[in-house]
C-alpha cells in the first residue's frame, strides 16, 4: 500500500516552450555548454548524445497533458491488493525485464553507474548521504528514493533537486503512452512502484547522470530496482523486523531477501548486524563471490567539527556506509584517489561537505509552527520522523529525547534540521515545555511492539508525553492526488484502528501507574477523526495557554503521516 499525496496545483501545467527550445538548441552549442559547466561529467560518445537528444525531443512531443492527468494515470496503476498477495501474474519479477525492452532501456541500464542500497532502516538516508558526497565532487547525480511525502517528484532528484514538473511530465507520458501501446494480457501494465522505478531508469538515462543511486523499495531480490544487473557497488543498511508478511518472519529470511541485490563479483558493504542476519549475508556473499565488508559507524573526529545534515545518533551508522559506497564509486568510475578510512585522520573536505549538506524530509526533522509563532506567547514545534519498525522507533525516541532537552536548554526550537528554521523565543526551561505524541501506523504494523519501544526509550531519557493523539492519515492509498482532493474531515471515516492504537497506549500508561514508577506519568490520550482537526486542537491549545509554554509534538509511526503533517503546517 502506498500513501500518495501531492502539493496542490491551481493550474494545469504543460511542457513549456522554454523546455522544448532547450531540446532544440544546436547540438554543438549544447555539448560546449555541457563540458564547460560539468568538467568532471563523464563524456558519452557523440553518437549516444545525438541519440539521447532525439529521444528527448520525441518524448517532449508526446507529452503535454496536465499534472493532474498524469497523477490520475499513475493512480490507475495502484492495486488495492495486499502486498503479500502474489495471485496476480502481473506481479512476476521477470516482467520488469520485459518492460525495459518495451521502453528500449536495456542498453541504457547496462551503461548506468549504479549504487544500489537495500535494508530495513536507514537506506534512504544512506542513499541521500552517498548522492551528496558524489555531487560535491562535481559529478551529475540521479537519486531514486521512496516513498514521497508531499509530491511524487520527490522520488526523482537530479543533482540534489527534485525533478521539475515539466521534465516529469515529459518523461512520464513518454513511458506511460509507450507501455499502454505495447502491453497486453500476457504483459500487463506495470504496477505503481514498478512504473516509478522504470520512470527513474528513463529519467536517469535521458539526463545522462554520472551516478544513479537507487534505494530498494521493498526487500531486494524481487524489487523493481533489482533489474540492474551490474551495479558499481551495493550496500545493505541496518536490518530489522519489517514487512514480515512478505520477506519472512526471521532476521535470517529478511537478510536473505535483502542480499538478493548482490551481484557476481560486485563489491558490497554493510553495517554491523545481528548475528543471525550477518551469517546469512555472509553466506549469500560467498555464493555470489561478493567481497562483503562490514563498515563501522562514522566518528565525529572524522568530520572535523562539522555536523551531519541528517540529525540523530543513528545517522552516523548510515553516514559510515555512505562514505564506503561513495569511495568505491569515486575510485572505480570517477578515477579519483580516495584514501581508505583507516588511513584518514579526517575525511576529505568534499566528503565532509557532502555529509553536512545532505537533506531528506521526514527523517529527524524539526519544524516550528509559523502559524502559532506570530500569534501567541507560546510555542508549537513539530519533531517529525517516519519511524515504523521497532528498531527505528527506538532510534526516533532517542533522537527526540535528546533534541527536546537540548532545545529547551539552548532556547532554540531545533538546529537547522533539513532546512527548518529555529524559533526566535528566549530560553525555555523544562518546566515550561510539554511533550505530545501524534501517532498513526499502518494496520500491518504491530503497535504492541512500536509503542512500548517508543515510550520506554523516551522515559529512559526522562521524557514523558503529556498527551497522545491518534489520527487517520489524510492520504489515501489508492490514489495519487493533490491536497485539494483530500477532505479535511470525513465523519464516515473508520477509526477502529486508531482506537486500537489508543487502547495499546492506555494499557502502557496504566501499567506504569500500577507499578508506581518514579517520575511523571504520561497523561491522557485522544482519537481525532482527522489530522486537520488534531492540528487545529494543538494550535488552539497553544493560543489558550495562560503561560508561555512550548509544546513539542513528536510525529511518528508512518512516513505518510509525516508527509500529511508537513503539507498541512506549510499551507
Curated annotation (Swiss-Prot):
Gene3D superfamilies assigned to the protein according to its UniProt record, in alphabetical order: Mur ligase, C-terminal domain (3.90.190.20), Mur-like, catalytic domain (3.40.1190.10)
Any one GO CC term of the record: chloroplast
Cofactor note: A monovalent cation.
UniProt binding sites for Mg(2+) 1: 146, 215
GO biological process, one term: quiescent center organization
Annotated metabolic or biological route of this protein: Cofactor biosynthesis; tetrahydrofolylpolyglutamate biosynthesis
Enzyme Commission number: 6.3.2.17
Primary site of residence: plastid
InterPro entries for the chain: Folylpolyglutamate_synth, Folylpolyglutamate_synth_CS, Folylpolyglutamate_synth_euk, Mur-like_cat_sf, Mur_ligase_C_dom_sf
Record SUPFAM superfamilies: MurD-like peptide ligases, catalytic domain, MurD-like peptide ligases, peptide-binding domain
Tissue specificity: Expressed in both shoots and roots, but expression in roots is higher compared with shoots. Distinct expression in the quiescent center (QC) region of the root tip. Also expressed in vascular tissues of the cotyledons and hypocotyls, and the first true leaves of 7 days old seedlings.
One example GO MF annotation: metal ion binding
Superkingdom to which the source organism belongs: Eukaryota
Keywords: ATP-binding, Chloroplast, Ligase, Magnesium, Metal-binding, Nucleotide-binding, One-carbon metabolism, Plastid
Cofactor(s) listed: a monovalent cation
Binding site for ATP: 122-125, 363, 385
Chemical reaction(s) catalysed: (6S)-5,6,7,8-tetrahydrofolyl-(gamma-L-Glu)(n) + L-glutamate + ATP = (6S)-5,6,7,8-tetrahydrofolyl-(gamma-L-Glu)(n+1) + ADP + phosphate + H(+)
Mutant lacking the gene: phenotype: Has short primary roots. Root hairs are also short and wavy. Epidermal cells of wild-type roots are two times longer than epidermal cells of the mutant roots. Short primary roots of the mutant are impaired in F-actin organization due to extensive bundling. Reduced primary root growth of mutants indicate defects in both cell division and cell expansion. Total folate content does not significantly change between the wild-type and mutant in either shoots or roots.
UniProt-annotated binding residues for Mg(2+) 2: 243
Record PROSITE patterns: FOLYLPOLYGLU_SYNT_1
NCBIfam families (UniProt xref): folC
Role this protein plays: Catalyzes conversion of folates to polyglutamate derivatives allowing concentration of folate compounds in the cell and the intracellular retention of these cofactors, which are important substrates for most of the folate-dependent enzymes that are involved in one-carbon transfer reactions involved in purine, pyrimidine and amino acid synthesis. Essential for organellar and whole-plant folate homeostasis. Required for postembryonic root development.
Family: Belongs to the folylpolyglutamate synthase family.
Name of this protein: Folylpolyglutamate synthase
Organism: Arabidopsis thaliana
Amino acid at each position: 500500500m502506498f500513501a500518495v499525496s501531492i502539493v496542490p496545483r491551481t493550474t494545469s501545467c504543460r511542457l513549456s516552450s522554454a523546455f522544448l527550445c532547450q531540446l532544440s538548441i544546436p547540438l554543438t552549442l549544447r555539448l560546449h555548454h555541457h563540458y564547460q559547466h560539468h568538467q568532471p561529467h563523464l563524456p558519452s560518445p557523440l553518437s549516444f548524445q545525438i541519440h539521447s537528444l532525439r529521444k528527448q525531443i520525441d518524448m517532449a512531443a508526446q507529452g503535454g497533458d496536465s499534472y493532474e492527468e498524469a497523477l490520475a494515470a499513475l493512480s490507475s496503476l495502484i492495486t488495492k491488493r495486499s502486498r503479500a498477495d502474489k495471485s496476480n501474474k502481473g506481479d512476476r519479477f521477470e516482467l520488469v525485464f520485459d518492460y525495459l525492452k518495451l521502453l528500449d532501456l536495456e542498453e541504457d541500464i547496462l551503461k548506468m553507474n549504479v549504487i544500489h542500497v537495500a535494508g530495513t532502516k536507514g537506506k534512504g538516508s544512506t542513499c541521500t548521504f552517498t548522492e551528496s558526497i558524489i555531487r560535491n565532487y562535481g559529478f551529475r547525480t540521479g537519486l531514486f528514493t521512496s516513498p514521497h511525502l508531499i509530491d511524487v517528484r520527490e522520488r526523482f532528484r537530479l543533482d540534489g533537486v527534485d525533478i521539475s514538473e515539466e521534465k516529469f511530465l515529459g518523461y512520464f507520458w513518454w513511458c506511460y503512452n509507450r507501455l499502454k501501446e505495447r502491453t497486453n494480457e500476457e504483459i500487463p501494465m506495470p504496477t505503481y512502484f514498478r512504473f516509478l522505478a522504470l520512470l527513474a531508469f528513463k529519467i536517469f538515462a535521458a539526463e545522462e547522470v554520472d551516478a544513479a543511486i537507487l534505494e530498494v523499495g521493498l526487500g531486494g531480490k524481487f524489487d523493481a530496482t533489482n533489474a540492474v544487473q551490474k551495479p558499481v557497488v551495493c550496500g545493505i543498511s541496518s536490518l530489522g523486523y519489517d514487512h514480515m508478511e512478505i520477506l519472512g518472519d526471521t532476521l535470517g529470511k529478511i537478510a536473505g531477501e535483502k542480499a538478493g541485490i548482490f551481484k557476481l563479483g560486485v563489491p558490497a558493504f554493510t553495517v554491523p548486524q545481528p548475528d543471525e542476519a550477518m551469517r546469512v549475508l555472509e553466506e549469500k556473499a560467498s555464493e555470489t563471490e561478493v567481497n562483503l565488508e562490514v563498515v563501522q559507524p562514522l566518528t565525529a573526529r572524522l568530520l572535523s567539527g562539522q555536523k551531519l545534515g541528517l540529525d540523530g545518533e543513528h545517522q552516523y551508522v548510515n553516514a559510515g556506509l555512505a562514505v564506503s559506497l561513495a569511495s568505491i564509486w569515486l575510485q572505480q568510475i570517477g578515477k579519483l584517489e580516495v584514501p581508505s578510512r583507516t588511513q584518514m585522520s579526517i575525511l576529505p573536505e568534499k566528503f565532509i561537505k557532502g555529509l553536512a549538506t545532505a537533506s531528506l524530509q521526514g527523517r529527524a526533522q524539526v519544524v516550528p509552527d509559523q502559524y502559532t509563532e506570530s500569534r501567541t506567547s507560546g510555542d508549537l514545534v513539530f519533531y517529525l520522523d517516519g519511524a515504523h519498525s521497532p528498531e527505528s522507533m527506538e532510534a526516533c525516541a532517542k533522537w527526540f529525547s535528546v533534541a527536546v532537552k537540548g532545545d529547551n536548554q539552548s532556547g532554540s526550537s531545533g538546529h537547522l534540521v533539513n532546512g527548518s528554521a529555529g524559533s526566535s523565543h528566549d530560553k525555555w526551561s523544562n518546566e515550561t515545555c510539554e511533550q505530545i505524541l501524534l501517532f498513526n501506523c499502518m494496520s500491518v504494523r504491530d503497535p504492541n511492539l512500536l509503542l512500548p519501544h517508543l515510550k520506554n526509550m523516551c522515559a529512559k531519557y526522562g521524557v514523558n508525553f503529556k498527551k497522545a493523539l491518534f489520527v487517520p492519515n489524510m492520504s489515501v492509498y489508492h490514489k495519487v492526488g493533490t491536497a485539494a482532493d483530500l477532505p479535511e474531515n470525513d465523519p464516515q471515516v473508520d477509526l477502529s484502528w486508531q482506537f486500537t492504537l489508543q487502547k495499546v497506549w492506555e494499557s502502557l500508561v496504566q501499567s506504569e501507574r500500577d507499578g508506581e514508577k518514579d517520575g511523571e506519568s504520561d497523561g491522557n490520550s485522544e482519537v481525532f477523526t482527522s489530522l486537520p482537526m488534531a492540528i487545529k486542537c494543538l494550535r488552539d491549545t497553544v493560543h489558550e495557554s495562560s503561560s508561555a509554554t512550548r509544546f513539542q509534538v513528536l510525529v511518528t509511526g508512518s512516513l505518510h503521516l509525516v508527509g500529511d503533517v508537513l503539507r498541512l503546517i506549510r499551507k
